[in-house]
Amino acid sequence: MKFNPTRLEIFKNLFHSVAEEMGAALRRAAFSPNIKERRDYSCAVFDGAGKALAMGDHMPVHLGSMPMSVAAAVAALKLGPGDVALLNDPYAGGTHLPDLTMVMPVYTPAASLPAFYVANRAHHADIGGAQAGSMGLAREIYQEGLRIPPVKLLERGQLVGDLMSLILANVRTGREREGDLTAQIAACRIGERRLIGMVAKYGRGEVGAYGRHLLDYSANMMSLALATIPEGVYRGEDLLDDDGITDNPQRIAVTIRIRRRKAEVDFTGSAPQCAGSVNAVAAITESAVFYVFRCLLDEQVPATSGLMRPIRVVAPAGTIVNARLPAAVAGGNVETSQRIVDTLLRALSRAIPSRIPAASQGTMNNLTFGGTDTRRGNAPFAYYETIAGGTGAGPGCGGADATHSHMTNTLNTPVEVLEHVYPVRVQRYAIRRASGGRGRFRGGDGIVREIKMLVPTQVGVLSDRRKIPPYGLSGGSPGAVGRNEIVEPARDTRAARQKGVPGRRLASKCNFHAPAGTVIRIETPGGGGWGAVESKTREKKKKKASKRNRVEAFQG
């Protein structure tokens, strides 16, 4: 079949539209605000060999690791027509336990093997474990929730009821989980239907051929992007504040070797896996690498598995970037992934300084809470959210305020929805002024968010950048560190709020019981600044002098 670049563009957009429509269906059918409002989900399309052909414009931390989930499901199960695999095991293709992934084969008529796979991943607000929200402090993965290896949730199109019952018996909010899981099944079926329709219209041969062309095109574009980076060895390192169990900083180190249009990304020198939950599995580390190098390309280049062909990732086993069972990993997905990105960008800033921004907030500021709602007949509830912060400034532009960045791509939960669904009141939601780092271009400001618990509640905070600030680049100052506080019920008065009463400081990672009336205050970090402030002052003086000279020349 003769290659046609116009047809390539058509098929690129067709595959992408399938992933996007899957996401729209999942969002509309979901029960939980975390999926319906915050859009904490991702969808993708894969070829029959498990290579990603298209990814929705969803969550980078999900998408870059999803090929491993598909590979794990295909290796563990014989997936026939109508089957849907479910998994969340970080040590078998998953990321952390709240992220439940579904994988469905797509069989075209009369085919004996799948032509495609469709997959989606969604963060469930609770999947059991010791703490409501399944993101609490832990030393082992067994404390974090229900661990699901690749299993069939649907077989020949029929729900495996015993498995669903087992899952719902181990979570706090069974009705919500059932609704979200059903929405994920619907998203898979939408993807299957669209791909079968595509094959019916264009033929399996042409659709398959252009799928392979997309992989090759992505690989070639990544090779060209690597060719723009000077050959050499570039190193970077950064630290997590602690692991939640000890106060010891956790080191992430990377060496990037660029040679002959290829890159080796080596994390040798990173800290050993730690006692707490900020361990990342290999899928998370590869996902962060995928994201950073994808950012070097034009946005029109398709996000496929081909992008990783010229890139080799070395993540030593038993370290914080490739933890072994039974390490706890809930924070590795949300916090360590962000620090890996910061470390990679710092290394690349030594190679291509004019293209790399300063560090963004570097944390997702995860907040979980749960309990029983006495206003609604003691109905159980569990909620999860991440809170935005400042992004790093870059060459030629300041950072954005109050924005999710890098490995997350979620929205916020509207205050009206949050207060309607859960027994809480949002007392303050504002930009944290002057928290961005100073520089020729200033880092973005973070957020101040205050939530009052109206019933006794179990609360968890999983955050970072509370001790070590987001770095600036090219002479820019770091952004402000974040801060977590609790205001006891007796101190939360109108007069105290007007005076800005300080709260009791919380650790970056903690779990606690909050009596009714307790206020949780989260102040998120600002982004780092870029460029020295002095250069900005000199530039203003030059502009004034130039203007004065032009006026004098005109008058003369």
Which stretches of residues belong to each language-model region?
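Glycine/proline-enriched, intrinsically flexible loops and inter-domain linkers
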Residues: 1-109, 114-264, 268-556
